[in-house]
A protein has these predicted regions:
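Short loop segments and helix-boundary regions at transmembrane helix junctions
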Residues: 29-112, 209-221, 240-241, 265-266
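Cytosolic-side transmembrane-helix boundaries in multi-pass membrane proteins
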Residues: 246-268
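Transmembrane alpha-helical segments in multi-pass inner-membrane proteins
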Residues: 192, 198-247
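Hydrophobic alpha-helical transmembrane segments
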Residues: 14-19, 62-67, 90-93, 133-138, ...
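Small-residue-rich segments of transmembrane alpha-helices in multi-pass membrane proteins
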Residues: 46-56, 94-105, 123, 127, ...
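Membrane-helix/interface signature in polytopic inner-membrane proteins
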Residues: 145-178
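Transmembrane helix-bundle core of multi-pass membrane transporters
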Residues: 10-12, 91-150
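Membrane-interfacial amphipathic/re-entrant helices at transmembrane-helix boundaries
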Residues: 1-22
Length: 268
């Protein structure tokens, strides 16, 4: 593994793995416990329209993606309040709308733009730039600081919104801000993980940790550790087997989840 780090692109990829393992499983834990695990898929699909606008208009896809995702995050919370008993309706509406808009925008662009969109669809952790790695560490710092400062309020909000409301917490504002932070994180992860697989890195490590952890904090720590080890293993395998890194990482997480689920079932 150390020999791989002699390459500059592998050094950047390894740093990106460290950054993503610090924040994506933390957000994933909240998403799962809030029964919003599909939100990561929804916002990643919506982000494609932001990428499309950026490529067609000739501006930074990252900037346009963040702008679109922030709007979608607010709208998603509105839909969640409208369809309280059917929250998946809001995610379905936004997901399909995001894909439709991206296809329409790209159809009006050049063929080279379509090729660039494919890079954002599947991502490539080994081709990300130093600026993109830095942006991942910035969002990691933001997520960790916010988690440290607002862990108790988010804990109450996650498990019982009614109690959070009675305690005087700004439930709607907190939910919107959480959606927005998650959206920005997804937008910054897309160049490395790809829009189609970004939810894997966010949700699967947290899903595995929930099978092993004994309390809320231990689940978060386990999720980050599992996320880091799984991504490093996927990076290592993809280099030697010559497979896409994001796909290799996904297979590893799914395999670990299935193995742990089977072991726990037989133990019981």
């Amino acid at each position: 593994m150390l020999s791989l780090l002699s390459y500059d692109f592998m050094q950047r990829a390894f740093l990106a793995v460290i950054a993503m393992s610090l924040f994506s499983p933390v957000l994933g834990t909240f998403l799962i416990l809030r029964r919003q695990s599909l939100m990561s898929d929804t916002l990643s699909h919506v982000s494609l329209s932001g990428v499309a606008f950026g490529l067609v208009l000739g501006i930074s896809p990252t900037v346009s993606t963040i702008a679109i995702v922030l709007i979608a995050a607010v709208f998603l919370e509105y839909l969640r309040t409208v369809y309280k008993s059917f929250m998946e309706i809001g995610t379905a509406i936004l997901m399909s709308t995001g894909l439709a808009v991206s296809l329409i925008v790209m159809s009006k662009g050049k063929s080279s733009s379509s090729m660039s969109l494919d890079q954002y669809l599947f991502g490539s952790i080994v081709t990300i730039s130093e600026e993109q790695v830095l942006s991942l560490f910035v969002i990691a710092a933001v997520v960790l600081i916010l988690t440290f400062l607002f862990l108790r309020p988010m804990y109450i909000l996650t498990f019982d919104e009614d109690t959070a409301f009675v305690d005087g917490l700004p439930v709607r504002t907190m939910s919107i801000l959480f959606n927005m932070v998650t959206g920005v994180a997804i937008a910054l992860m897309i160049p490395a993980a790809g829009a189609l697989l970004v939810s894997t890195i966010m949700v699967l490590p947290a899903s595995i940790a929930l099978r092993l952890g004994k309390n809320f904090k231990s689940v978060m720590l386990l999720a980050s550790a599992i996320g880091f080890l799984g991504m490093v293993a996927g990076l290592y395998i993809s280099y030697y087997v010559e497979t896409p890194a994001s796909a290799s990482i996904t297979i590893i997480f799914v395999t670990v989840f299935l193995l742990i689920s089977l072991v726990r079932r037989f133990i019981k």
